[in-house]
Swiss-Prot record:
The keyword Ion transport does not apply. Residues 287-307 have a biased composition (Low complexity). Keywords: Developmental protein, DNA-binding, Homeobox, Nucleus, Transcription, Transcription regulation. Sequence-specific transcription factor. Part of a developmental regulatory system that provides cells with specific positional identities on the anterior-posterior axis. Acts on the anterior body structures. Seems to act in the maintenance and/or generation of hindbrain segments. The keyword DNA-binding applies. Residues 208-267 bind DNA. It holds the Pfam family Homeodomain. This is Homeobox protein Hox-B1b. A motif (Antp-type hexapeptide) lies at residues 183-188. It comes from Danio rerio. Induction: By retinoic acid.
């Protein structure tokens, strides 16, 4: 028995027992042979991919180390019911001080590691589907691998996902919803673009077009007085009135145009003739109450002179 163990140890190379590289805690359970690091081993006495080989921690439960070595590993265990990392659990050997390493025997010729790094946490409840495919020689069919709904898992992660990809169908649906949005009537109203203000030579903005001007009481009184005497203003008079009332020429011109339209509207409605009669009556009363000493002309004398 000892010679067999010596044979298996001496054929593993000079760096079989390394300084605890890639080891796991004693309490942690993980894959003994399928979870090998990059320093994997092909059972022909040649290390592949590195100088060390990481194996599983073992716990002593009354089984000798030699018996464990002589027994072949059978990884075709259906662990889908358990759903955690009890995958191929072994017991701890007495040589746990040597980096928790485990030496493969010649009975393990059928085991070929498919990937150097294999995380059990990424498996979830689907451990049973990976048990045989990871230790079988040759390629593994795509049906053994489960698809991930939220992207591809990280190569050396612990169950986390590196990319949370959104399906392209949801993006296309959102774009179609935006394109098919209903168009309401108030969206069809044609709006005039804002008027651009021309900049003067020295960077001073020109006068903006003001829709409505709020005149003061004094300005309205002076404009009404000017309209009473002259319904139409010359350009010189318009400039003078605008300078007196602190307005521009355009404002005075527009006010007179609106005042004339209002006067025509009043005449059509019949309110303007009443105002004329009142003015005539008031002028007649002023003539009767005049202080002149000359008597008024009689109608007979007027008729005789006309003849």
């Amino acid at each position: 028995m000892n010679s067999y163990l010596d044979y298996t140890i001496y054929n593993r190379g000079s760096n079989t027992y390394s300084s605890k590289v890639g080891c796991f805690p004693v309490e942690q359970e993980y894959l003994p042979s399928a979870c090998a690091s990059t320093n994997s081993y092909i059972p022909e006495g040649r290390p592949v991919g590195g100088n060390t080989f990481t194996s599983a921690p073992h716990e002593t439960h009354g089984t000798s180390y030699a018996q464990i070595q002589s027994q072949p590993f059978h990884l075709n265990v259906d662990m889908g019911k358990t759903g955690h990392s009890n995958f191929c659990k072994q017991t701890r050997p007495p040589h746990s001080d040597y980096g928790h390493q485990h030496v493969l025997t010649q009975a393990d010729d059928h085991m070929r590691l498919q990937s150097p790094g294999f995380s059990v946490v990424n498996m979830g409840a689907n451990i049973g589907t990976y048990s045989e495919s990871n230790c079988r020689p040759g390629s593994v069919s795509a049906s053994h691998y489960q698809s991930y709904a939220y992207g591809e898992p990280e190569p050396h992660g612990y169950g986390s996902f590196s990319k949370y990809q959104v399906s392209p169908d949801s993006d296309s649906d959102s774009k179609t919803n935006i394109k098919q949005a209903p168009t309401f009537d108030w969206m069809k109203v044609k709006r005039n673009p804002p008027k651009t203000v021309k900049v003067a030579e020295y960077g001073i903005h020109g006068q903006q077009n003001i829709i409505r001007t709020n005149f003061t009481t004094k300005q309205l009184t002076e404009l009404e007085k000017e309209f009473h005497f002259n319904k139409y203003l010359t350009r010189a008079r318009r400039v003078e009135v605008a300078a007196t009332l602190e307005l521009n020429e355009t404002q005075v011109k527009i006010w007179f145009q609106n005042r004339r339209m209002k006067q025509k509207k009043r005449e059509k409605e019949g309110t303007a003739p009443v105002i004329k009669r009142v003015t005539l009556c008031s002028s007649g009363q002023n003539a009767d109450h005049s202080t002149s000493s000359s008597p008024g002309a009689s109608p007979t004398s007027d008729s005789s002179t006309a003849i």
